[in-house]
């Protein structure tokens, strides 16, 4: 089986993180999975949602928004949600997934009385925009929280570890990792896997497209996902250390100690 980009079945696309792409955000990164590129920002502001105040819920909150910019796809201009007057169902589903994934690795009590707004804006879509968004948002959060600690706005980072995501699927009767658009379009089975860096599952999304899949195929995809996420988590750690080390070596050291990494 030959993949469109010539990769091996268990090979990720080239992944990169460019920090501080949005200087006014508390933390930001441009994440690239091959030709999929997403700007992920974390804006942390004082105050919590009204429902938390009314119910006397301690700590802070984290929420996410996701959008595909009008020029992000090759199929013509995509109208903005504000022009349509409503959020489309796909974007709504994805931003809820991003929020759930980040809250799995954020101790909201340590966020104190702050709200973290996560924004993921797709610049270019070539498959895996939701998984790239989760992965990039985790890096943006790590940068934002450590900077707040350095500035004295938080006592300690509420991030308990990175969360990463990757797609898997069955393409031409073979399980593969990190699908590009052409593979995703033609795959008979599609999985999205979200995991923490210590290999705990956060969410699994999987379905057949006019097809079924066996427990053996699912196990193979899960193992591919576990392998890929291990590689992604290391890239996330390197990206955060590089971003913080440029301006604050102490923050990079605190982060390593916080995550118990050498």
Which residues does each predicted region cover?
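Glycine-rich, flexible beta-strand/loop modules in the N-terminal catalytic cores of phosphate-handling
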Residues: 21, 28-111, 201, 205-218
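Short, conserved phosphate-binding/catalytic loop or strand-edge motifs used
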Residues: 112-120
């Amino acid at each position: 089986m030959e993949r469109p980009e010539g990769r091996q079945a268990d090979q990720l696309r080239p992944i990169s993180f460019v920090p501080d792409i949005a200087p006014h955000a508390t933390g930001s990164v441009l994440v690239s999975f091959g030709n999929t590129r997403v700007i992920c920002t974390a804006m942390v502001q004082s105050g919590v949602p009204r429902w938390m105040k009314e119910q006397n819920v301690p700590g802070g909150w984290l929420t996410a928004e996701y959008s595909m910019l009008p020029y992000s796809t090759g199929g013509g201009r995509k109208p903005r949600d504000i022009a349509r007057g409503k959020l489309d169902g796909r974007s709504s589903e994805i931003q809820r997934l991003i929020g759930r994934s980040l809250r799995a690795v954020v101790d909201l009590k340590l966020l104190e009385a702050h709200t973290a707004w996560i924004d993921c804006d797709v610049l270019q879509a070539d498959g895996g925009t939701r998984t790239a968004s989760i992965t990039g948002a985790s890096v943006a959060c790590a940068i934002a929280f450590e900077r707040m600690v350095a500035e004295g706005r938080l006592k300690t980072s509420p991030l308990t570890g990175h969360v990463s995501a990757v797609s898997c699927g069955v393409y031409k009767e073979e399980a593969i990792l990190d699908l590009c658009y052409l593979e995703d379009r033609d795959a008979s089975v599609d999985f999205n896997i979200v995991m923490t860096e210590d290999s705990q599952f956060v969410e699994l999304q999987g379905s057949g497209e006019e097809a079924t899949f066996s427990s053996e195929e699912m196990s193979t995809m899960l193992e591919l996902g576990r392998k890929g996420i291990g590689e992604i988590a290391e890239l996330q750690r390197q990206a955060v250390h590089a971003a913080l080390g440029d301006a604050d070596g102490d923050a990079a050291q605190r982060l390593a100690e916080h995550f118990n990494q050498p």
